[in-house]
Design a protein with these regions (language model features):
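Short, compositionally biased
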Residues: 42-48, 78-89, 145-166, 185-201
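Residue "hotspots" at secondary-structure boundaries inside conserved domains
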Residues: 21, 57, 72, 122, ...
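P-loop NTPase nucleotide-binding/switch module
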Residues: 97-153, 170-230
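Short, surface-exposed secondary-structure boundary micro-motifs
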Residues: 20, 34, 70-71, 89, ...
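Hydrophobic anchor at the beta1->P-loop junction of P-loop NTPases
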Residues: 233
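N-terminal accessory targeting/assembly segments
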Residues: 1-96, 101-104
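Short alpha-helix capping/helix-loop boundary micro-motifs
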Residues: 13-18, 49-54, 114-125, 159-164, ...
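ATP-binding Walker
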Residues: 239
Length: 239
């Protein structure tokens, strides 16, 4: 059963819950009647603090906040390329098809297309020993991007007991089953969820040394970017 809390106070995008809600830090929650997406950012002396990622106008004390039990996460898999997302991986182009240019509050759309089938090459077979980072499938996402699906870092070493043949699969369809050393089994798909607050582990990171010339003088002069690097221009929450 989902844990819930009651809104005690609201200050812009920040919502306060009084009492022991049972939520965890970084847990994803749904706020109010419109199920606005939020994240638990503070737990202190019987007070829970939630940051809401949408406009809070009209939200009132007494409304319910429902926990998901999971950290706020994104879905990693084929279909990310060519998509435009907001900060919590909502696909803006898909939302625009249903709600127009202005996003309605509380709108919920799958981050990636869960119905589309991708032709995939399964790179492991029964009996193979796999561990975190082992490539289990390759999908030609675009003409130049080969998407490689891997064993998640959270799964320890195990043995493949079932592997699907090469073919067309949705991103959530099980393609490989592994038996862990403790005897439990895990089904893996082309896509996997990953908490946004936890950095993805890397074996080797190449330094970014080639400039990315944007043609925008304020960026190229004051905020130069590197090819292969990461940049963000943050705005206000809920705007």
């Amino acid at each position: 059963m989902s844990k819930t809390g009651i809104i005690y106070g609201i200050n812009g995008p920040v919502v306060y819950l009084k009492g022991d809600s049972g939520f965890k830090i970084s847990e994803m929650v749904y706020v109010g009647k419109e199920n606005l997406v939020g994240e638990v950012i503070g737990l202190k002396k019987g007070m829970t603090t939630v940051q809401v990622f949408e406009e809070t106008t009209g939200l009132r004390p007494g409304e319910t906040v429902t926990g998901t039990g999971d950290a706020i996460s994104v879905l990693l898999g084929p279909g990310i390329i060519h998509n435009i997302f907001d900060g919590i991986q909502r696909p803006l182009e898909e939302i625009a098809k249903s709600s127009g240019k202005y996003i309605s509050r509380g709108v919920s759309v799958d981050s990636l297309d869960t119905q589309k089938k991708w032709h995939s090459h399964i790179t492991v077979k029964e009996g193979d020993v796999v561990g975190p980072g082992t490539i289990i499938a390759e999908t030609q996402e675009t003409a130049s991007i080969l998407h490689k699906s891997m064993v998640p870092p959270s799964i320890t070493e195990g043995t493949v007991i079932k592997a699907a043949p090469d073919g067309d699969y949705t991103i959530l369809e099980p393609i490989v089953t592994i038996q862990l050393n403790d005897g439990t089994t895990k089904e893996l798909a082309l896509a996997q969820k990953w908490p946004i607050r936890i950095p993805r582990p890397t074996h080797l990171r190449y330094p970014a040394s080639v400039p990315l010339v944007t043609g925008q003088r304020i960026l190229d002069t004051l905020f130069p970017l590197a090819k292969g690097g990461t940049a963000a221009i943050p705005g206000g929450f809920g705007t």
